Amino acid sequence: MALLTAAARLFGAKNASCLVLAARHASASSTNLKDILADLIPKEQARIKTFRQQHGNTVVGQITVDMMYGGMRGMKGLVYETSVLDPDEGIRFRGYSIPECQKMLPKAKGGEEPLPEGLFWLLVTGQIPTEEQVSWLSKEWAKRAALPSHVVTMLDNFPTNLHPMSQLSAAITALNSESNFARAYAEGIHRTKYWELIYEDCMDLIAKLPCVAAKIYRNLYREGSSIGAIDSKLDWSHNFTNMLGYTDAQFTELMRLYLTIHSDHEGGNVSAHTSHLVGSALSDPYLSFAAAMNGLAGPLHGLANQEVLVWLTQLQKEVGKDVSDEKLRDYIWNTLNSGRVVPGYGHAVLRKTDPRYTCQREFALKHLPHDPMFKLVAQLYKIVPNVLLEQGKAKNPWPNVDAHSGVLLQYYGMTEMNYYTVLFGVSRALGVLAQLIWSRALGFPLERPKSMSTDGLIKLVDSK
C-alpha cells in the first residue's frame, strides 16, 4: 500500500485507484490462491517497472545522524507490500483497518471473529476472499499439515528446560529438509519461477506451524500427550486449539482474533525485517522464518505481553486485587520514578491507542467483563495515559497490543507465559511469508545497505 500511496501522489490518484481496483477484483472467482497470484504478478511487475522508470530517482526521505545511531527509526528504506502502519490509525492490511477486517473477512459458522485464512488471502492478493476461498485455504493447509518424522523425533527429545521459542526455531529450521525451493534452486530453476516454489514452501510452513507449536506445548506442559490428528473439516485456528488441548469455543474464537491481529505490522519490525533480509539471500522460507523467530524471541520484540503480566501480578501482590484509582496512580508513579516503564504502553510508531488493543478490549467486554485481571487492565486504561502525559516523556501514552493479550490467554487457562511468544510466531508467519512470496515474485535483490563508522560520519558532517 505504501507503493500505491506513492503512485497516487506521483502519477495521479485516479490511475492508482484503477490499479487497486484491478488488483482487488482480478480472478476473484477462483478458489486456488496460486492461480490468482499467477494472474496478479505480471500486472504488478509491469506496474512497478513503469513506476521505477518514471520515478526511480525521486527522493523519498532524508537520513540523519540520529537515525543511524537510533535504530534507523523513521528511515524509509524498504518496500513492504502487505501492511502499512499509520501513526494515527494503526495497522492497515492491504489498505483495510482492523475494524474493517473484522467486519468484512469471512468467519467460522456461528463465529464472530475473522478467520486468519481470510487475512492471509487478503495479504497475498489484496482481495477480500469469499467463504469458498477461505474454505479452500483451510482444507489446503489441513492437507499439508503433517510433520516429517525427524522433526517429531527432535521435538520429543528436546530437554524440558529449552525455551519454547528455541524449540520452535530449531524445528522450523529442521523443516528445511522439505523445501521445494531449495531443491529446485539446486537444480537450476529459472528466477522467474522462484515465487512458485516459495509459495509452496510458505503454504507448507504455515500449515505445519500449529502442529509444531502444539507439539512443543504438549511436551512442555501436558506430559507429552498426543496432539491428535488434523481435522480437514475444521479451520486452521480450530485445529490449533484442538491440538493444544483446549475445547472451549470462546478460546477458539479468541485464537482466531489473536492470530489475525498479530499477523503483520509493517516491514520494519525485527521479525518482518529479518525474514525479508534473510530471504533476500535466497534462503528458503524455512530458514528465513526461523531467523525471524530468533528475532521475535528477543525481549524487546516478542516478550512484551509476558512483561505486562509480570507487572500486573506484582501490582496485585503489592496493593491488592481491588485497588482504588488513587492507589493505582501512586503505584504507576512509583514505577516511573524508579526508572522503569509501564509495560504495554507506548509504541515506536503509533501515536494513538493501538487498534489491536481495542479489539481485544471489545472481546473482553463481551466475554469476560467481570474478570478481575481484565477489570484491572481496564482501570489502567483510564489512568496510565494521563500519568504518562503528566510525566511528559512519552511520545505515545496509549496502550499497545501487549497490554491486553496475556490477560485474555490467562483467563482461558493458558497460564504458561513462556509459551506466549510461540503463539505470536505462528501468527506472524501469515504476514511475513505473504510478503516473502511477493519479494521473490517482484525480484527484490539481495539487501545490502551501506554502513559507516563514527569517524566516517564525522568526516562526512565536517565536509558539509
Swiss-Prot record:
Residue list for modification N6,N6,N6-trimethyllysine: K395
E.C. code: 2.3.3.1
Resulting phenotype, D402 to G/E: Greatly reduces catalytic activity
InterPro entries named in the record: Citrate_synth-like_lrg_a-sub, Citrate_synth-like_sm_a-sub, Citrate_synthase, Citrate_synthase_AS, Citrate_synthase_euk, Citrate_synthase_sf
One biological process term in Gene Ontology: citrate metabolic process
Compartments, as annotated in UniProt: Mitochondrion matrix
Active-site residues annotated for this sequence: H301, H347, D402
Residue numbers covered by motif SIFI-degron: 2-21
Enzyme class at the top of the EC tree: transferase
Sequence positions bearing N6-acetyllysine: K76, K321, K327, K375, K382, K393, K459
Disulfide bond residue pairs: none
GO cellular component: mitochondrial matrix
Pfam families for this protein: Citrate_synt
Positions of oxaloacetate binding: R356, R428, R448
Miscellaneous comment in the UniProt entry for this protein: Citrate synthase is found in nearly all cells capable of oxidative metabolism.
Function description: Key enzyme of the Krebs tricarboxylic acid cycle which catalyzes the synthesis of citrate from acetyl coenzyme A and oxaloacetate.
Subunit organization: Homodimer.
UniProt protein name: Citrate synthase, mitochondrial
Taxonomic lineage of the native organism: Eukaryota, Metazoa, Chordata, Craniata, Vertebrata
